[in-house]
Amino acid sequence: MVQSIERTMKIIRVLISDEKQAWPISDLASATGLPISTLHRFLDSMIQYGLVEQEPVTKHYKAGYTWMEIGFTLHNRINFRYVARPIMEELAQEVEESIFLSVPAGYDSIPIEKVESPLKIRIDENMGERIPLTIGAPNKAILAHWKPEEVRKVVAAQLAPALQQPFLDQLAHVKETGYAISCGEKTEGTVAVAAPIFSYGNQIVAALSINAPSFRVTEDRMSFLIERVKQKAATVSAKIGGV
């Protein structure tokens, strides 16, 4: 296993070097010190996973775009939480409510960052708690931008048949308007307003939400909260390479 990893890394390091855009198999063998028969075996497996591409005409090899996707994903996971934090603090001061950052985790979401409301009566959530994706505004903001086939799997797993189409209709509205609202879905007496956060390639990576006691959210204030959470989510998206 260790030897296979070492050989794979040798191949990748050569393919991503600045020396050539694409490599003939003979040059790749010289650069890696690996036999051509071994190279063919490794390259065939790597092509299946998009880690390597073979040019159709020349048959030369180059690094695949999967590496770019992996790099962007890792970059976002490492950095976007820290990018979001000061923006969340600004939002908490503007609206005087608790602000949360949630990320998808399988068919659930996990709150990974929060800024508490400066007011005495405020909403709290447990960081790291798994919440089913069909519950709450942040999750609707995330799920509305998943691929339809994945959405159907989540909905089928978490909702009774009679509830599935109404929920899908909600998601369509969320995607169209750019925000989601929930009232007491997770915690009675609370309201949440959320907007999606996107990274490179318009990939949904998180949701930003405002959570408030329902008695503080009038119709006029709801419009204000929607406008602010959408604007701040868009700011985070822009800073991590999204739309």
Question: Whereabouts are the PLM-identified features?
Answer:
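N-terminal helix-turn-helix
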Residues: 1-75, 234, 238-242
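Sensor-regulatory modules in signal-transduction proteins
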Residues: 197-200
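Amphipathic alpha-helical effector-binding/dimerization core
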Residues: 58-154
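Juxtadomain coupling helices with adjacent low-complexity linkers
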Residues: 164-172, 188, 206-243
